[in-house]
Amino acid sequence: LIRRHCIALGLLAALAGFFPALAAQPGSRSPTVLVVGDSLSAEYGLKRGTGWVALMERRMAQEKIAAQVINASISGDTTSGGRSRLVALLKQHKPNLVIIELGANDALRGLPLPMTQDNLQAMTLAAQESGAKVLLIGMQMPPNYGQDYGARFAALYATVAKVNKAALVPFLLKDVADGPDSARLFQNDRIHPNEAAHPLILNNVWPAVKKLIA
């Protein structure tokens, strides 16, 4: 009996060596995705679990992608606020992917565009230096901000992404703010997308996320 037990153990060990993917990897863990955003990612005015970040987590489960999602988004946050708390978040969660969705509140408050770009640059660099990949989520301003301002605001995301070779989603609210059904996709404040809009938002983000964590 002892001899049979030893033979069985030896066979299992041999199989584990022959099929390394089946063997446990010491110290391995599921990838962590850290989302640092504002109210557009923090489920402002929504029923809990209906925002695009929660929907992304469910999509991962459906597609059998074992990843942990940390949503560190805060309503009203600016790029300065995100920058000030990112280092601590990186140390705490050690993410494999950092999604940065900030900047809209900078524009709403009339903050200088160079400052917004500098903050996004610093956040991207800090995340990359920690070993994480970065996905920048861009925003666009309504026409009443002026064509020149809108173009410069949108361009800063592309600039930061290009300089740092980071991934980019050019416009989080594509097909939401600029679609034919935009009137029914916003809350009463006409600023924040409603529950019906968030599956569309996820459609904008998911292809890039999947590529980065696959």
Predicted regions and their residues:
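N-terminal export leaders
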Residues: L1-L11
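A detector of low-complexity, intrinsically disordered, Ser/Thr/Gly/Pro/Ala-rich segments
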Residues: R3-H5, S30, N96
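C-terminal segment of classical bacterial N-terminal signal peptides
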Residues: A16-A21
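Serine-esterase "nucleophile elbow" of acetyl-processing enzymes
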Residues: A23-S75, R85-K94
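Alpha-helical cap/lid subdomain in secreted, periplasmic
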Residues: A61, I65, G81-A214
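N-terminal helical cap/lid subdomain that shapes the substrate entry/recognition surface
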Residues: G76-S80
